[in-house]
Amino acid sequence: MAPQPLKVGTSKLSKMVKSAPKTAGKAKKRAVEQVSEESDEEFGDQGSGIDMSDDEEEVDGDDEEDEDEAFPEFDSELEDNDQEEASDEEQDEQDTSDESEIVEEDSDSESGYNTSDIERMYASDDDLSSEENKDLPVDEKLSRLIAKNTVKPDDSIGTDDKISRAKEGVGRLVPSKHVKGSFVREYDEYEAGYGSESSTEDNPNTVGNIPMEWYDDLPHIGYDVNGRKIFRPLQGDELDKFLANVEDPSAWTSAEDKLLQQNVQLSDKELDIIRRLERAENPDADFDPYQPTIEWFTGEGKERVMPLSAAPEPKRRFVPSKWEHKKIMKIVKAIREGRIIPNKPSAEKPRFYPIWSDADQHNPHVMYMPAPQLPPPKTAESYNPPEEYLPTEEEKAEWEAMDKEDRKTDFLPEKYDALRKVPGYKNLVQEKFERCLDLYLAPRTRRVKLNIDPDSLIPKLPAPKELKPFPIASTVQYRHPGDTRVRSVSTSPDGQWIASGSEDGVVRVWDLGNGREVWRWDLHAGPIQYVEWSPSREESLLVALVAGKIAVLSPLALVAPHIAAQTLTHSNTAFATSSATTKQGAGNEVKGIESVKWTRPSERERERGVLVYVEVPGTPKQVTWHRKGDYFATVASDAANKSVLIHQLSRHGSQSPFRKTPGTIQRVAFHPSKPHFFAATQRYIRLYDLAAQKLIRTLQSGVKWISSMDVHSGGDNLIIGSYDKKLAWFDMDLSAKPYKTLRYHNRALRSVAYHPTLPLFASASDDGTVHIFHCTVYTDLMQNPLIVPLKILRGHKVIDGIGVLDLRWVPGKPWLVSSGADGEVRLWCS
């Protein structure tokens, strides 16, 4: 309730008059007269208090005159005060009458103690007996007044039987339930509304401003004003909400009351406020954003012409400051000493906070040792482990029968189809306890880590300019008519001629130096699959492969006479023997391969340099010569068990080294110094001993499909290319797996080749590039081969997804010859 207004009574005013003689006089008399009239009316209404008679008023007036004579020094001050207050007397009387009306209204509507009641309780007997004060002189009155105000008040004052002095007629008195013989006053209930000062709106849930999540696990949501639980209202699911939004039009104008946990309908006024906020307007409908401007200080007749201060400017405004000069000199000294750097570029702040930075880590103590890390979880600890990790019934029984110290694990793996179905781990507390024991009881040791520079682990490769010479540019181009695809290319052992086989069925011989075509053979048997020069320098033999036929050729007019004679003797000797025929020679050595026929070409073809035809099953795709130049092997993947054939030119004999092929043979090669034979299938490379007729070893390529193969001149290293864009280097003294697997081409590799004498090798791919590498093979078995990338040669065009098809090194020179699907053969020189 609002505090009750206090009304000054007569008794208290008399005390004020006695205790403050300086304010005596006319002003005091006016105050006494005004208050006495009000107090008399109030005392009359209450039926209590002290009434003053006319005689007492006259006595008071006499006392005042005596006081004026006794204290003449106050007269002048009182007269001045009377003059100053005379003008305010009328206003004071009017204010006093207004206050009396307000006091009367408040006294009718409120109960409790009045000021007059309080003063009456604390009034002394001397104040009530005015008869005794009449005869006392002024000095005695002053002495009593001083003595009264210097004595401790009596504690027993106000302890009378009447506890409540509320006005009669307000409320009703009922016997007290707690104190016998006492009464308490009951009042009517007051309904609080919007006009009330204590409450604005009744809310049945009185929990206050707390998170309602605290009641999520309880059936109720709070308590009412009487302490009873407010149970949670029924909540519909998402389907109910959807139906309410569809069927109930009022659902769109309701909001959820989080305190009551139910939807409350918004009033029209609240909806209007929401609409205004959505339109970015003022929520008050009566607000006028375009009201006229009120010119408080700039309107007509309201200009400020007088300055706020007309004091003259001080001298310090025109004299340089001494203290600023000292501060500036300190800054100048700091700049000269370098402690302050002017125009220092500000350090760029990081855009993102470095959460992994070690800058904020403190240096640990010298004796600090970090705790060992927990081992990472294993597959058996998964909530959904594979079936092989789940124990059987026998294993479960065996595990349960074992002691805890003998068990390998403290748990049995279990399988759950969802993480939410995994129960609590019962050994969690025990494991954490044992972890804590290990942390503060188990001794720790510090392991010294090897400080190895990562750069030292990377091999230091020499610069490419130190490994010259190697091919770097295209110097000569050998263009084929019609841009026909050139599938194969080969160089003569003397390095003077280049042979190429194209899809138009023509074998061409080119001059290496000037790029002129000097010889050609049209075999009329379809595309030329492969061409290969014999490695023997004493002869000039060229083998070309077409569908179902092998052609042994020689450009006799281009070579020296003694070389031409040796070539003819070597190729035609078997025809001169008695066992030789025009269809098949050395028939005793061709057991099981009657389909292979050595035939002699016509006279006209022999004049053009066609020496021998060999009819073979299937379509041979690759040919390779033995280092002596008498044997050569062919591969026809579509010939089943006769896919690999080894032919002897001097005896016109052919034989199949395999009774049953170990897969689809892709490439074959002779060992450069031993009677060994390499056969590459799609994924494996097998090494055979031809003399002992046995398998020596099998190399695992690690690729999906081998496309090409070449053997190093030393015989202990091998490279292969694959259609899955990989090149693998094998060190057969090291392992059966690749020593290096390189993937640098963007498309399939078509050909790889070692240089016969120099430490170089190259690879060709369908991406139209040729990569040149330096390779040094050391005689020391403890040292690995050195591989250094040197150059990427670009020049061939990619036609229908096919780029460079074949490449060969020029013997004795760091030059490379390549052929592509664009109908060009290019010579790359250093």
Swiss-Prot record:
Residues 131-142 have a biased composition (Basic and acidic residues). SUPFAM superfamilies: WD40 repeat-like. GO terms for biological process: maturation of 5.8S rRNA from tricistronic rRNA transcript (SSU-rRNA, 5.8S rRNA, LSU-rRNA); maturation of LSU-rRNA from tricistronic rRNA transcript (SSU-rRNA, 5.8S rRNA, LSU-rRNA). It is found in: Nucleus, Nucleolus; Nucleus, Nucleoplasm. The keyword Transferase does not apply. Signal peptide: none annotated. Keywords: Nucleus, Repeat, Ribosome biogenesis, rRNA processing, WD repeat. GO terms for cellular component: nucleoplasm; PeBoW complex; preribosome, large subunit precursor. WD repeats lie at residues 481-520, 523-563, 660-698, 701-740, 744-783, 799-830. Residues 1-142 are annotated as: Disordered. One of its GO terms (molecular function) is ribonucleoprotein complex binding. Residues 35-44, 52-109 have a biased composition (Acidic residues). Pfam families: BOP1NT (PF08145), WD40 (PF00400). Component of the NOP7 complex, composed of ERB1, NOP7 and YTM1. The complex is held together by ERB1, which interacts with NOP7 via its N-terminal domain and with YTM1 via a high-affinity interaction between the seven-bladed beta-propeller domains of the 2 proteins. The NOP7 complex associates with the 66S pre-ribosome. Component of the NOP7 complex, which is required for maturation of the 25S and 5.8S ribosomal RNAs and formation of the 60S ribosome. PANTHER family: RIBOSOME BIOGENESIS PROTEIN BOP1, RIBOSOME BIOGENESIS PROTEIN BOP1 BLOCK OF PROLIFERATION 1 PROTEIN. Belongs to the WD repeat BOP1/ERB1 family. This is Ribosome biogenesis protein ERB1. It comes from Cryptococcus neoformans var. neoformans serotype D (strain JEC21 / ATCC MYA-565).
